[in-house]
Swiss-Prot record:
Designated name of the protein: Probable septum site-determining protein MinC
Xref: PANTHER family: SEPTUM SITE-DETERMINING PROTEIN MINC (PTHR34108:SF1)
Subunit structure: Interacts with MinD and FtsZ.
Family the entry assigns: Belongs to the MinC family.
GO BP annotations listed: cell morphogenesis; division septum assembly; regulation of cell septum assembly
Superkingdom, natural source: Bacteria
Keywords on record: Cell cycle, Cell division, Septation
UniProt entry tagged with the keyword Cell division: yes
UniProt keyword annotation of Cell cycle present: yes
InterPro entries named in the record: CAP/MinC_C, MinC, MinC_C_sf, MinC_N_1, Septum_form_inhib_MinC_C
Pfam families registered for this protein in UniProt: MinC_C, MinC_N_1
Function statement: Cell division inhibitor that blocks the formation of polar Z ring septums. Rapidly oscillates between the poles of the cell to destabilize FtsZ filaments that have formed before they mature into polar Z rings. Prevents FtsZ polymerization.
Length: 228
């Protein structure tokens, strides 16, 4: 029996929403609406599979659930009742990045390369033990650390955390965002033999070399403010 609302990111389906299977369902939906509202626009556009545990939903319950998600800009893919939600929804897919449940500290660790067309969204920090290919997207409310090449889109501190960072062994994103500030990597593919860290300074995103390399290079940051 579950008593808490749990939202987990996956690379296979987008989001997995686990709902409590005790208490009035209307009360659960009220708690869900409050949780989503407190996350701002983080989950907007998210595709969701919902697991309701041992609860059996009526057609009216399903409609109310879908409306609650739609009000937060989310898309309901399916509703599952009974069984193991992690086994059914997060079963490994050949060649797909692994996205295990977040360990202590609300950090999501992905142990494979994130491919083009795949998207990771997580409420917390994200660590990727692999590359982020062009066409892949990583969004986090906290830091993003890539132990490989970052060539896709990365958005750290997406709910407004300007102290968030994006770090990578090779930092060449097609687009880089921290909070509301948007930048991109310089044109070309200059050699890089050390990790780099991107952070906000003033209203620009700058890239700092690793501790032993005290060089600082500015991104071609437009300092654009994301439309809200």
């Amino acid at each position: 029996m579950r008593q808490d609302i749990v939202i987990r990111g996956t690379t296979r389906t987008g989001l997995l929403l686990l709902l409590p299977d005790e208490g009035e369902f209307s009360a659960v939906l009220e708690r869900l609406a409050e949780r989503l509202a407190s996350s701002g626009r983080f989950f907007v556009g998210g595709r969701v599979q919902v697991h309701v545990g041992n609860r059996r939903l009526s057609p009216e319950d399903r409609e109310a659930l879908e409306q609650t998600l739609q009000r937060s800009g989310m898309v309901l893919l399916s509703v599952k009742e009974g069984g193991d939600p992690l086994a059914e929804v997060q079963a490994p897919e050949a060649g797909a990045p692994s996205a295990p449940p977040p360990p202590a500290g609300n950090t999501l660790v992905v142990t494979k390369t994130v491919r083009s067309g795949q998207e990771i969204r997580h409420d917390g920090d994200v660590i990727i033990l692999g590359d982020v290919n062009p066409g892949a997207v990583v969004v986090a409310t906290g830091h993003i650390v890539v132990m490989g090449a970052l060539r896709g889109v990365a958005h750290a501190g997406c709910t407004g955390n300007r102290t968030a960072i994006v770090a990578a062994t090779k930092l060449r994103p097609t687009q880089l965002r921290i909070a509301e500030v948007i930048g991109r990597a310089p044109d070309g593919d200059a050699p890089q033999s050390y990790p780099e860290v991107a952070r906000i300074r003033g209203d620009l995103i700058v890239v700092e070399a690793s501790a032993e390399k005290r060089q600082v290079s500015a991104l071609e940051a437009v300092g654009a403010k994301e439309d809200r």
